[in-house]
């Protein structure tokens, strides 16, 4: 039994949201229900497992994700603080009792904005956004198990934006600040406890530290300290270090959330797309917009085709600025002064391509050559980062060119022999790997899969560098710092972030583009391995000396 409990804990700690949703969906005949319990003088929301046929859900109770489809998009003009007001003598189920009551809140999602008139073009029926079966007619709220008020659908949202409404009069006319009462209680439920005890469908909230309710802080004191691909929180607190991990605000398999820079309000997918056409990037700029739950959050989201947000968070933008500031190695001039004369004389690639490597590569010799260079550099010149970057970019370009040639039937060479489950391109890659790695012929299926994975990994890295080479020029491959190269190789730096890095370098006022432009002609010749002997190294160095760039100190060599 202990091992079963440990296994479940490990699953909950390590699995992604997809795995957890699958687990929740397979709990039948059990389901997750929520029960309010009173601990001392404070309210606690406790998730419990119940058998479907033994304890059917009460009318008005907040049902689990398997029974309710909550969504984003509805807007109401009022907020309700955390429902913790003690009510003595409240009528619950016709019985007079003491306990805690909550405001009459429906399952509709609350927002501090107005109804987005463009929500009707999202591609799904707006009527499915809400649960229509819950009725909160009584002041005491719906009645749950054990004679206690059932939890509201807005309970989690109310805690999330309680720091806004701490001093806001209640919609029903009450002016008390109930969230302050909770914070002052020694037994009050904290945001951390609420997040631990509530299931938030389709969201994953990772690494919440130091998350305590307070009269002055609220939920924006929850500071995640590690990157997460799906997180419901974004940190806006300025950082003392520019190299923090990226925190993105995006929903996996659900509706995207973006922020209007002018109003600080969250928009739906279409509004976000329109806004992205008018601004270079979307960022969470206001302190109040620091949490998804502040404006248009709920305990669930409308299920729609999976989309990824192209917006970049505040923390990611700080990382982008740091990358742009440190993209050039600090010793770039000394480095070029020592190597440029030799490169102009001999080129950068060194060993000539061996003709005997072209066996069985009719029609895709260039792709074979590019991959041969990548592998040779890995084996013999592990310290030669510049040539490795150039080789990976060439591998990506030749692969794209070869695929285009095959797909458009422009290829006139002999097609490789295909096998079951292996098409033309896959068989072509197998031939290239076989020509490069002699051990391919005796490798088992697992070893062959590993060699294929290495091929595609190098090609993907080349594609990421090509995203920078195309707008900035080949000199970025030659002059970049080791920190910058590490960021580009790190897959947590998304394609959207690489695009922002490119824009930041282009808009830099420190002379970055001037420096790269001066080095681009000779870098391109070295990259293409042609015409490099026609450049005058002394003139290039003289121009670079006149355009000396102030770079961040302490940047390591590439």
Curated annotation (Swiss-Prot):
<keyword id="KW-0804">Transcription</keyword>
<dbReference type="GO" id="GO:0005634">
    <property type="term" value="C:nucleus"/>
</dbReference>
<keyword id="KW-0539">Nucleus</keyword>
<comment type="similarity">
    <text>Belongs to the POU transcription factor family. Class-3 subfamily.</text>
</comment>
<comment type="function">
    <text>Transcription factor that regulates the expression of the gene cluster that mediates the biosynthesis of aurovertins, fungal polyketides that exhibit potent inhibition of adenosine triphosphate synthase.</text>
</comment>
<protein>
    <recommendedName>
        <fullName>Aurovertin biosynthesis cluster transcription factor aurF</fullName>
    </recommendedName>
</protein>
<keyword id="KW-0805">Transcription regulation</keyword>
